[in-house]
């Protein structure tokens, strides 16, 4: 019987010949300095004189016809392990390289100086990667675009409307009572679900319920009962729809979404049904709140945004929907990973407990202003987001020719900013594989701010950052006050990329009452 590998060899040899036709040789580079740009690109302190090369000279993995590097990615674990493969490629090809996955072509950046150079040249309306599956759905259902897919002045107009309420610390601090209301119920839920060893079956699902209840109370002043016995099925369906949407859109980023739509593939059907479910859940909540506060819009931030900033109802639907789905999934994910990291580092957890008790004696309820006096709490969250981020990379699309490193990149180039690579690099963090929150408090060792970007960078930074941080800080205060988070085994837990980074198995942690 012939070996399957032998059958592939003629095909591989043929593809290699096709690949090599007309392609200039690629050289490896690891230089991260930025040279002088054309006139339209503002100079930054990192630029030096010298000639640049074009994008075709960039190093990178094998680029097969039609497939790009998909074969190599699949051999290395598939899209679920692409974050690890990207880290490997940066070690092999340097701090900037080019990779094509099917129809998706991008330039990858993996150094703080390159990201700083990009930030210094950022335009008034920086562009993100075009999320074609999301756009295809909105066009298919005649829905508006939200902040994740809007561009230009339209993006700026909608962003400005929400920014007034979501990016000002004084506005976010007002939400601590609502966040604490949900956390009080969540503590009861933990008590109810713990087994005799303190373990909770499907912890991630329970954290999703907490984050869903929290963001819904903030956005709609509505509770769905997910943390009580009488749970509304609608809420569970919403959470499931988010996970389906996240797991399906990536597949249509590397293969033409137009083809999926035309053939009505199972992926397109699942993606469309998921978005239908999400919008069906959100729209009535927004309508109810707008009606409730129609006579006093200043008393409610959604009504205030709707009436004062002249957004259409469809625009409000789209923006709030994207805000809610991001809050549900990424906030729960971040809390899950920091609990895991604390369970593996009991000395860190003990120091955190001491700080919380010093600020909140007698198990007082934490307030937003209390968090200001907890630098180690903030450092723990930062360190967890560095070591185990929810999102391993973010994107930009260049809206003008830009010089990065030794290369002049044309307008329209898609950039992948590999933020997980930055956080895990020994070049940026000493003992990068260790969970050491103290590093953020050591004044004599300054950390490059462009080496840690869990919420993105520049004008398109995550608009829900301050709200997410407050939710997570308060949640940690509640949980660490009441429970010792214990690791139930010492085996490593791998991270899988399913839209965000999730654990490869149930997290081995237990909640033991103090």
From Swiss-Prot:
Xref: Pfam families: p450
Top-level enzyme category: oxidoreductase
CC terms in the record's Gene Ontology section: mitochondrion
A GO MF label: vitamin D3 25-hydroxylase activity
The keyword Mitochondrion belongs to this UniProt entry's keyword annotation: yes
E.C. code: 1.14.15.16
Disulfide bonds: none
PROSITE patterns xrefs: CYTOCHROME_P450 (PS00086)
The protein's required cofactors: heme
Compartments in which it is found: Mitochondrion
GO biological-process terms attached to the record: cellular response to vitamin D; osteoblast differentiation; vitamin D catabolic process; vitamin D metabolic process
Keyword Protease found: no
Residues that span the membrane, as ranges: none
Catalytic activity: calcitriol + 2 reduced [adrenodoxin] + O2 + 2 H(+) = calcitetrol + 2 oxidized [adrenodoxin] + H2O; calcitetrol + 2 reduced [adrenodoxin] + O2 + 2 H(+) = (1S)-1,25-dihydroxy-24-oxocalciol + 2 oxidized [adrenodoxin] + 2 H2O; (1S)-1,25-dihydroxy-24-oxocalciol + 2 reduced [adrenodoxin] + O2 + 2 H(+) = (1S)-1,23,25-trihydroxy-24-oxocalciol + 2 oxidized [adrenodoxin] + H2O; (1S)-1,23-dihydroxy-24,25,26,27-tetranorcalciol + 2 reduced [adrenodoxin] + O2 + 2 H(+) = (1S)-1-hydroxy-23-oxo-24,25,26,27-tetranorcalciol + 2 oxidized [adrenodoxin] + 2 H2O
InterPro entries: CYP11_CYP27_families (IPR050479), Cyt_P450 (IPR001128), Cyt_P450_CS (IPR017972), Cyt_P450_E_grp-I (IPR002401), Cyt_P450_sf (IPR036396)
Keywords: Heme, Iron, Lipid metabolism, Metal-binding, Mitochondrion, Monooxygenase, Oxidoreductase, Transit peptide
UniProt-annotated binding residues for heme: 462
Role according to the record: A cytochrome P450 monooxygenase with a key role in vitamin D catabolism and calcium homeostasis. Via C24-oxidation pathway, catalyzes the inactivation of both the vitamin D precursor calcidiol (25-hydroxyvitamin D(3)) and the active hormone calcitriol (1-alpha,25-dihydroxyvitamin D(3)).
Similarity comment text for this entry: Belongs to the cytochrome P450 family.
Descriptive protein name: 1,25-dihydroxyvitamin D(3) 24-hydroxylase, mitochondrial
Gene that specifies this protein: Cyp24a1
